[in-house]
Amino acid sequence: MTSNWMKIVLKAQKIKYGKNLLLKGVPVIFNKKGSSIEIGDNVTIKSSFLSNLVGLYSRTIIVTRAENARILIGNGVGISGATIYARKGITIGDNTCIGGNCKILDNDFHPIEAETRNKLLSDPHGGDSDLVPAKEIHIGKDCFIGAILLF
């Protein structure tokens, strides 16, 4: 069951979510203007160390960081203390389990080349710049992603 307060937060962030969304603890969710986050039916998101005894290091974090970025979480997905951070797009298929403390990042947060990094420092858009490379991630249906993995 999702609290009324979290429903208000999701609505304010323009996040679409399906039936029976179960939030255990309070996730960090940020949906950049012009981007989208969609959560399917029967999804469970665990965000407190007591909600999964594997030893969660942090709350679940779901972020779109650039315009037109998209995160799509399918039906029946379970997430525990993971970070899902998109500049382009991340799709998680139906009935997939994301283990405790996983990091799913479609970008490296900064360019590898020093010259391009220096350009980014003077870019007025900063972290929103196209200078930060990103590639879409697609995780299929019925997958099991073990704990403490980085994509």
Describe the residue ranges of each PLM region.
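Domain-scale signature associated with acetyltransferase and cell-envelope carbohydrate enzymes
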Residues: 1-105, 111-112, 122-123, 132-142, ...
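Short glycine/proline- and charge-enriched loop/turn segments
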Residues: 117-128
